[in-house]
Amino acid sequence: LSLSGMYNGEMISAPEYKSLASLDGAGFHGGYNHIVYQMVGQPLGVFYLPHSTGLESDGNGGYTYGIADLNGGGVSLEDGEDRYVAGQAVPKTILGSNISFRYKRFDLSVQINGAFGHKIYNGTSLTYMNMNIFPDYNVMKAAPKQNIKDQTATDYWLEKGDYVNFDYVTLGWNVPIEKVQKLKKYVRSLRLAFTVNNLATISGYSGLSPMINSSTVNSTLGVDDKRGYPLARTYILGLSINF
């Protein structure tokens, strides 16, 4: 299917396959590195990839990604050939919640976010598990053992992207000023608080973080493109005084 029409007497049309996200940089020198597409009849941002049958020996001690012949006409990585829609990059469900508890002089606040129903392409593993880039680039610890010598983007590194992230947790204590005679004269209220940012992330994703770009900015929609860095966990101790 395709979309076409007329505007001011000129024929216009939308391509059947339009790449939205791809990989470049270390180990990529052109070729079939397009991963996420805009396609007629599909949700915005779908993974349109060759299907990998696993690792195959290259006959020289290394391994390459076996590719399935989906259309029975011989393996071809061109759009419309041996590729299939393997999932979507945009989450189907997004979670955001702020929960607060209070007990006597203690209070607890928790902020949670999450996303479900989408997939992530682990471009970091595709790139740095490829021994062909070594020693020009560093590789992962497991790379020499697996000895993969291939950079072809298939569904081999496509993973579920579901996650729940505890954005922050804050525990507070309102000090009973009325019981401290020396402070009672000068201080109206005193509160101590301890906050942990980025406490934990629950996810089956094997990369550094499932919280990657979910837009078409920089053509990285749904792709862990090896440039991201996980958010650091920080600890904050706070003191609030009202005179």
Regions found by a protein language model. Give the residues of each.
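C-terminal beta-signal and terminal closure region of outer-membrane beta-barrel proteins
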Residues: L23-T53, K149-A153, S203-F243
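Extracytoplasmic gating/loop element in the C-terminal half of outer-membrane beta-barrel translocons
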Residues: S57, G61, N113-L199, G204, ...
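Conserved small-residue
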Residues: L1-A89, N197-L199, G204-G207
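Generic recognition of flexible, low-complexity loop/linker segments
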Residues: Y84-V85, L95-N98, V180-K182, D224-K226
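Extracellular/periplasm-exposed beta-strand and loop segments of Gram-negative cell-envelope proteins
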Residues: E16-K18, Y37-V40, D82-Q88, G123-Y128, ...
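Residues that define the transmembrane beta-barrel architecture of outer-membrane proteins
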Residues: P91-L95, D162-D167, R188, L231-Y235
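Transmembrane beta-barrel strand/turn architecture of Gram-negative outer membrane proteins
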Residues: L1-G41, T93-S125, V169-V175, S189-L199
